Amino acid sequence: MDPSVTLWQFLLQLLREQGNGHIISWTSRDGGEFKLVDAEEVARLWGLRKNKTNMNYDKLSRALRYYYDKNIIRKVSGQKFVYKFVSYPEVAGCSTEDCPPQPEVSVTSTMPNVAPAAIHAAPGDTVSGKPGTPKGAGMAGPGGLARSSRNEYMRSGLYSTFTIQSLQPQPPPHPRPAVVLPSAAPAGAAAPPSGSRSTSPSPLEACLEAEEAGLPLQVILTPPEAPNLKSEELNVEPGLGRALPPEVKVEGPKEELEVAGERGFVPETTKAEPEVPPQEGVPARLPAVVMDTAGQAGGHAASSPEISQPQKGRKPRDLELPLSPSLLGGPGPERTPGSGSGSGLQAPGPALTPSLLPTHTLTPVLLTPSSLPPSIHFWSTLSPIAPRSPAKLSFQFPSSGSAQVHIPSISVDGLSTPVVLSPGPQKP
């Protein structure tokens, strides 16, 4: 016997075989009732079939309860060891193969394309929870019917149409991007689409090129006035940093000026420089940003040819002033003694500028005869020596003549030995 046979099929086989009347027998063949004459022997034979030597009737009865829910076998009440096949006529009509009862035959009505004989075998196995395999040589024919029914189902429209329908929706997504991309390509004035992926970045590049083309135009059209030029430079710098940097060539002073802006010194520059006259304010800002456009370079070079040469000398000075407080911190002003002391000592008033002209030619922006107290405060706070030098007192009393007379003597010492300029205990 095949070990894959279910329990109800095993009992039906025992009932049909001759010579098993001493262990199992029909009590009502027409009604499908049978009795386990020797329940323990039946359980032992079932254990041998399943390779379980410890099988007994208790385990066999629990296994039979599984078929109660399946409506295949039920216990006859009031009689011990008596069971009944729920739909025995269908079971008796089968051949050597054990067929499922009536509830399983109703399943065939839902699948008209499959042969009824094959359904008797396959669903019966699914009901029992075990695969249907032939019990012996006589089972080979029904097994072949089961395979043929499966092949018929595979060839039937239920399976093939489902597979074809699942594959049909896939081709449409490919032409859909192709239809959308040609419409986007003329809008962005890009090249003709060579592929769905190659044409997608073209509108973005066109937009970026349009933005790059628009940014230099804004710089060229700016008026040469000092306050407006500074405000427009501040607006253009973040835009240039946000757009493609390769279009804009920025020299060293601009990069360090942006670093100083991050440390909080650019706002002071915007407050102090608009007070400088336009003639000297424009050359002071020109080294900050240098563009590749020929129109801007030619315009400023034609307007101020004599100013373009001193820019090279002013570049380090414009950068060291905002960066010196954060990098040096006051204790070590030896790197820029001239610029630090000059910026802190020239600030008090216009009376000191003629005396310091030969010693401070590298900072012409500070030599304005019309410097105001806000600019004095700006240069005194940015110089590394000013917070500790008596120059801060000159800012607190800009109108006093005694402070202006006292500063030149200290400035001479500051130029030679900058360490002497920090005698006060004031904190930076």
Swiss-Prot record:
Alphabetized SMART domains for the sequence: ETS
A Pfam family assignment: Ets
Modified residues (Phosphoserine): 324, 383, 389, 422
Known outcome of mutating residue 249 to R: 9-fold increase in transcriptional activator activity. Reduction in sumoylation
Result when mutating residue 230 to R: 9-fold increase in transcriptional activator activity. Reduction in sumoylation
Post-translational modification: Sumoylation represses transcriptional activator activity as it results in recruitment of HDAC2 to target gene promoters which leads to decreased histone acetylation and reduced transactivator activity. It also regulates nuclear retention. On mitogenic stimulation, phosphorylated on C-terminal serine and threonine residues by MAPK1. Ser-383 and Ser-389 are the preferred sites for MAPK1. In vitro, phosphorylation by MAPK1 potentiates ternary complex formation with the serum responses factors, SRE and SRF. Also phosphorylated on Ser-383 by MAPK8 and/or MAKP9. Phosphorylation leads to loss of sumoylation and restores transcriptional activator activity. Phosphorylated and activated by CAMK4, MAPK11, MAPK12 and MAPK14. Upon bFGF stimulus, phosphorylated by PAK1.
Compositionally skewed regions (Basic and acidic residues) per UniProt: 248-261
Name of encoding gene: ELK1
Assembly mode: Interacts in its sumoylated form with PIAS2/PIASX which enhances its transcriptional activator activity. Interacts with MAD2L2; the interaction is direct and promotes phosphorylation by the kinases MAPK8 and/or MAPK9. Interacts with POU1F1.
Name of the protein this chain belongs to: ETS domain-containing protein Elk-1
Consequence the record notes for mutating residue 389 to A: 34% reduction in ternary complex formation
Annotated tissue distribution: Lung and testis.
Role noted for this protein: Transcription factor that binds to purine-rich DNA sequences. Forms a ternary complex with SRF and the ETS and SRF motifs of the serum response element (SRE) on the promoter region of immediate early genes such as FOS and IER2. Induces target gene transcription upon JNK and MAPK-signaling pathways stimulation.
An example Gene Ontology molecular-function term: DNA-binding transcription activator activity, RNA polymerase II-specific
Record localization: Nucleus
